[in-house]
């Protein structure tokens, strides 16, 4: 389990594509690069991936099975991604822990500023939304938060302003796709 708390923001510097897979080269933020090695398991935009190569200041991940259920196929060089390294054995994860098993993607419906930060309204596909309720935790691009409001398949999440500095949520806009992990599945 991961915490669902983004530890840093990486930048995609290279993407190599083949017929059914991709290799993404990501530049890590200072201080986080030293914490990974080949075979480190981590979240990249909420999806559990394994480091396959480190070359210079670049960390590489192979993406194959996740292409059909995530936003990776639409990412391009220069895009920012949320990063979280798997906690060490025995560390407490807490509420809203993520597995990195992305169930699908959703579209940002609207972004509204408020006193505490901003609210993001996300249109969750009906198949993913059917068991969700207000106060359930959900993972969006690797950030675990409780749902504060829900109307049909539109959920509302409230983000604080301090997340702008450490995550890629500043790049969210209407109709942008995000990765979704449902936490209350049985």
Curated annotation (Swiss-Prot):
GO molecular function terms attached to this record: riboflavin synthase activity
Cofactor binding, per record: Binds 1 6,7-dimethyl-8-(1'-D-ribityl)lumazine non-covalently.
Record keywords, A-Z: Luminescence, Repeat
Gene3D superfamilies found in the cross-reference section: 2.40.30.20
Segments annotated as Lumazine-binding repeats: 1-96, 97-186
One record GO biological process: bioluminescence
Cofactor: 6,7-dimethyl-8-(1-D-ribityl)lumazine
Function: Antenna protein that modulates the color of the bioluminescence emission of the luciferase. In the presence of LumP, luciferase emission is shifted to higher energy values (shorter wavelength).
Name the record gives this protein: Lumazine protein
Organism in which the protein naturally occurs: Photobacterium leiognathi
């Amino acid at each position: 389990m991961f915490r669902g708390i983004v530890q840093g923001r990486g930048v995609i510097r290279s993407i190599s594509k083949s017929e059914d897979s991709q290799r993404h080269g990501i530049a890590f933020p200072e201080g986080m690069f030293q914490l990974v090695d080949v075979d480190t398991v981590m979240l990249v935009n909420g999806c559990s991936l394994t480091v396959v190569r480190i070359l210079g200041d670049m960390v590489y991940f192979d993406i194959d099975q996740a292409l059909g259920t995530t936003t990776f196929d639409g990412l391009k060089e220069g895009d920012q991604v949320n990063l979280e390294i798997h906690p060490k054995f025995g560390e407490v994860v807490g509420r809203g822990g993520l597995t990195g098993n992305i169930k699908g993607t959703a579209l940002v419906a609207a972004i509204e500023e408020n006193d505490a930060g901003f609210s993001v309204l996300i249109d969750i596909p009906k198949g993913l939304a059917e068991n969700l309720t207000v106060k359930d935790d959900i993972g969006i691009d690797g950030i675990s938060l409780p749902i504060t409001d829900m109307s049909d398949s539109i959920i509302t999440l409230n983000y604080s302003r301090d997340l702008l500095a450490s995550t890629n949520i500043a790049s969210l806009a209407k109709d942008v796709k995000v990765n979704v992990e449902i936490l209350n599945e049985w």
